[in-house]
């Protein structure tokens, strides 16, 4: 297999037998594969039963490996995606977003639960303090309208990290309007046999 990279300035590296036209063709394969994955999920809805499935589902949407991008998967009670919502993009180590816009988009999707997802171009598959604080703010905002945040996954080019699996996703308590930091189930369902899903 030919491994192909770009230099920091975006120019293709010199690989014997690979000219500019071939380099462009190789890069187009990635875009075609991404489009195929997105269309496949739209035509054949799936239940996202765990963090790994969420990462596989959302990874094709991340189009720029050099900067952070932030998405939200809006789902129904059966954990079937209703919509993939683009939230924001930023610089290689930071992305800023509008909580009010995120809230409006979630409500408009008519979802009952969401999974948050962003990438770390640096390759560090871990949550920063800023990631944790942002997640808590989103849980508070969505909790007030009855939308549950199941997880916040972080993707790198070769790995992923689930905040829920590491006990970093608190629950919203509708009675008090506060966050509960006690341990919660990582994922609410893990059926033995996948259901036939109709959107």
Report each predicted region and the residues it spans.
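A short amphipathic alpha-helix within small helical-bundle interaction modules
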Residues: 1-15
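Long, charged amphipathic helices and adjacent flexible linkers at domain junctions
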Residues: 37-54
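Charged helix-capping and loop-helix junction motifs
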Residues: 98-100, 129-137
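Short beta-strands and strand-loop turn motifs
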Residues: 114-120
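Short, solvent-exposed loop/turn segments at secondary-structure junctions
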Residues: 122-126
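Divalent-metal-activated hydrolytic enzyme cores
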Residues: 136-199
